[in-house]
Amino acid sequence: MISPEQSRAARGWLDWSQDELAKRANVSLSTVRDFEKGRRTPIANNLEAIERALTAGGIEMLVEQDRAVGIRLSRT
């Protein structure tokens, strides 16, 4: 599952604001803001929507042993 750090890094790479990500993921701005600041973890559906939006933007989430470790541009 995506981490707050991955979300921030991916947004930066895509040059998206938190508002842009929220719109693309169809979640509230406060959901993105609170998640990225580590205030709370969104419900599973919202967390998946955030990850899908970033993936659709061309970002691949890197995970090792069930731990989020980074991002990279998608190869496809």
Where are these regions (language model features)?
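Recognition helix of helix-turn-helix/homeodomain-like DNA-binding domains
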Residues: 26-42
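Short polybasic/polar patches that bind polyanions
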Residues: 12, 23, 55
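DNA major-groove recognition helix of helix-turn-helix/homeodomain DNA-binding modules
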Residues: 26, 46-62
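Short, conserved glycine- and acidic-residue-centered signature motifs
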Residues: 14, 43-46
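Helix-turn-helix/homeodomain-like alpha-helical modules used for DNA recognition
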Residues: 59-76
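Conserved hydrophobic/aromatic packing and binding residues within compact polymer-binding modules
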Residues: 7, 21-22, 32-35
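Short basic helix-loop element that most often maps to the first helix and adjoining turn
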Residues: 5-20, 74-75
